[in-house]
């Protein structure tokens, strides 16, 4: 079988990831309980320019900036709510509505890393570092007596960031 065909059948699995927030005791429970995280969407915005001999046409050209969707992480809320409290404290460290302090991004971690693992979950295939992250949104956490079983409580954190860098084989992918 050719190598191209082997690569087609060797698909990645949705569970091949680890979210890491280095040097952050506040968010350790969140990191351990991360359940799902997509690689955020990125785009180059379209710039409309005039075209045609009389300037009556419109051409779409690539813009000169990148736009990033936020990092969305769904996590399990543990029995003592440490994972939720850690994220709430991170939010308060960014903009504290109780004290009026607004430290912006000074108190949070420098970056978050999303590690994509191979199918054996022993080797890192790719890393994405999200720089200057901050929590903008925590979803609701619903308690309910109407469930037949005892499902896990989940919460979703929306984490904007300034930019990200993709690392593959020890090198930052910066240009083609």
Curated annotation (Swiss-Prot):
Primary localization class, coarse: virion
Pfam families, A to Z: Phage_T4_gp19 (PF06841)
Subunit structure as annotated in this protein's UniProt entry: Homohexamer. Interacts with completion protein gp15.
Keyword tags: Late protein, Viral tail protein, Virion
InterPro entries assigned: Phage_T4_Gp19
GO molecular function ontology, one term from the record: structural molecule activity
UniProt entry tagged with the keyword Transport: no
Domain of life: Viruses
Subcellular location: Virion
GO cellular component: virus tail
Its job: Plays an essential role in tail assembly by capping the rapidly polymerizing tail once it has reached its requisite length and serving as the interaction surface for the completion protein.
Claim: Membrane is one of the keywords in the record: no
Protein name, entry field: Tail tube terminator protein
Organism: Enterobacteria phage T4 (Bacteriophage T4)
